Curated annotation (Swiss-Prot):
Any coiled-coil regions, as ranges: none
Function recorded in the entry: Plays a role in virus cell tropism, and may be required for efficient virus replication in macrophages.
Protein name per Swiss-Prot or TrEMBL: Protein MGF 360-22R
Keyword Zinc tagged: no
The entry's keywords: ANK repeat
Record Pfam families: ASFV_360 (PF01671)
Native species: African swine fever virus (isolate Tick/Malawi/Lil 20-1/1983)
Domain of life: Viruses
Length: 357
């Protein structure tokens, strides 16, 4: 029998309360929480809302776990009380079909409203639903529940999506030569770096050391200068400085990692060419600020691509000059680089000149 709405509300209210040191970890308080079913992995369950999403916190999930992922984990563990609780709080019971492993648990999920089975389209939608939740716990649990799961491994549309994502940054392995399981693992690893989640980054780094240079590659491509600095100084890499710069120029606005590579000695003129080839005007202006001057070669590329915007920018070459404030810093300290070139702070001197012309 499902609990009443009042019971559900009472449990939810209790789970949102701050636990005072006066009562925690008292036996009485623990007893109340256990009686209410607000207990998981030998610790209390608390909830909080982040951007309209309910996140579950326990001692094991200190960074917060999305309610739907928490349901999937509870189903995997055959924890009937929590399956019911998370469903009452709004989790989609259909996601439980991903991790169900006994007939009794499947029966419970279906009694709570789950379908008989999920279509390939619904499997893909589940992936989309959980992939953008930015916490270390979410990234790690998503990887553990999905990366080796047949429902996801056999989804052709998901494979196309992941191949597209990895193709954008893969340079030291051929996608056709690795399994889809490894592709998914590399994908979740890259998301940890993109979202700048130290705990998740360390989890993947320790678990998948044989992914040679992957952490460095993702740090460059996703503009995570702090992680780039850490891994570059921690391990020897087979990737040369100019190749690192090419990766940093992969996406527009990667100002901190471009600058970091420049400080290591990468060719800023080649970076300017790469930026034009990728059609990134933001990176182009940074390269000009850092002294790049291969305007004629870049103009040829812009003309061949019929890119009027870049042609216009490059045509004002006689008005541009290096930005002394950027060149005088001369540091690989990620904190200082970030303060100088954070995307929300940095305003290109030469872009301002271009706009005034």
């Amino acid at each position: 029998m499902m609990p009443s709405t009042l019971q559900t509300l009472a449990k939810k209210t209790l789970a949102t309360q701050h636990i005072s040191k006066k009562y925690w970890p008292s036996e009485e308080y623990c007893y109340i929480l256990k009686c209410c079913g607000l207990w998981w992995h030998d610790s209390p369950i608390t909830i909080f809302t982040c951007i309209k999403q309910i996140l579950i916190k326990t001692a094991n999930f200190k960074h917060g776990l999305d309610l739907n992922l928490a349901l999937m984990k509870a189903v995997q563990e055959n924890n009937y009380e929590l399956i019911m609780l998370f469903t009452e709080w709004g989790a989609d019971i259909n996601l439980g079909l991903i991790t169900v492993n006994t007939e009794c648990t499947r029966d419970l999920c279906q009694k709570l409203g789950a379908k008989e089975a999920l279509s390939a389209k619904e499997i893909l939608e589940i992936f989309y639903k959980i992939q953008y939740i930015k916490s270390s716990n979410n990234i790690i649990i998503s990887h553990e529940l999905i990366s080796n799961h047949p429902l996801f491994l056999n989804n052709d549309q998901l494979k196309l999506r992941i191949v597209g994502e990895l193709n954008a940054i893969s340079i030291n392995f051929i996608l056709d030569e690795i399994s889809f399981n490894e592709m998914l693992t590399r994908y979740w690893y890259s998301m940890a770096i993109l979202y700048k989640l130290p705990a998740a980054i360390q989890y993947f780094y320790q678990s998948y050391k044989y992914f040679k240079d992957w952490r460095l590659i993702c740090s460059l491509a996703y503009n995570n200068v702090f992680d780039l600095h850490e891994i570059y100084n921690k391990e020897k890499t087979d990737i040369n400085i100019d190749e690192m710069m090419r990766l940093a120029c992969r996406y527009d606005g990667n100002y901190t990692t471009i600058y970091y590579c420049f400080m290591l000695g990468a060719d800023i003129n080649q970076a300017m060419i790469t930026s034009v080839m990728n059609l990134w005007d933001g990176n182009l202006f940074l390269c000009i600020d850092l002294g790049a001057d291969v305007f004629e070669e870049c103009m040829k590329i812009a003309i061949e691509d019929h890119n009027g915007v870049l042609e216009s920018i490059l045509s004002f070459k006689n008005y541009y000059s290096p930005d002394v404030s950027l060149l005088s810093l001369k540091t690989t300290d990620p904190e200082k680089i970030n303060d100088l070139l954070d995307e929300d702070i940095y305003k290109s001197k030469n872009r301002l000149i271009y706009k005034s012309c």
